[in-house]
């Protein structure tokens, strides 16, 4: 048994009995555990057990091989591959003679062309931020930038314009320019230019289509009613004259045709029928089988001869006695 245990320790293997779970009663003395495990003791240094005013470094500086900002060289390579298998004439019906990806000219400096201040490059110890030790003043004077302020530089117009890189040789080539349009620098102010009246006036009566519409598109409808100031309130309405039949009527079975009466003039102000909306009209409307004749509206206003609600003097009837006579009748006592 001792030799086998030594062999297992040398080879790094656990004994067979230790890997199996033992069942049953075990004594209370220290024995070898039935389940293998790996124990790892964690050692806490004394520097981390300190509470306030701890001088332990929170951010230790680790050295690695990764270069910092501004310490590497960027090489811009063309993404277009010069492979022999690619056809120079293209693969479409009308091949283009220009490159698909133009050379990109960067307008900004490269990553290693910046001048970074030394304050940003220098490493600081942030572990002393909450300590009671003496520290250097953290507020420093702002650096004066050498770049121009707004409205103090002339932006190049050539960079803002759109470049015309259309160099295709298609079968149906468009003659429309793809670049920016040239606008006039100075234009006439409002009211100082001539409008082409041919666009405003009615078009001539020429054949434009098979079924041309004759409806006017720009004319306003004339009003059929009278305008303001046309009414005369003092003038009375004229009664149309009756048409007289001729003296020698023609012998017909039907009566003589009479002309239509003329249209009455439009009513002026004050000639309309004004409806009294204060008193609503009474309409007894009901859908029941027994229609009630009781008015559902407010009562009529009181007349001047009727008494008011406080002019009555009601008399309470007193007690009265009755006698029961021989005829079995009740007789009131006087």
UniProtKB/Swiss-Prot annotation:
Belongs to the STPG1 family. InterPro entries: SHIPPO-rpt. It comes from the Eukaryota. May positively contribute to the induction of apoptosis triggered by O(6)-methylguanine. Residues 29-42 have a biased composition (Polar residues). Pfam families: SHIPPO-rpt (PF07004). One of its GO terms (cellular component) is mitochondrion. One of its GO terms (biological process) is positive regulation of mitochondrial membrane permeability involved in apoptotic process. Residues 7-20 have a biased composition (Basic and acidic residues). Its main location: cytoplasm. The keyword ATP-binding does not apply. The keyword Phosphoprotein applies. Keywords: Apoptosis, Cytoplasm, Nucleus, Phosphoprotein, Repeat. STPGR repeats lie at residues 67-74, 109-117, 148-155, 187-206, 225-257, 267-282, 306-316. Disulfide bonds: none annotated. It is found in: Cytoplasm; Nucleus. The modification Phosphotyrosine is found at residue 72. This is O(6)-methylguanine-induced apoptosis 2.
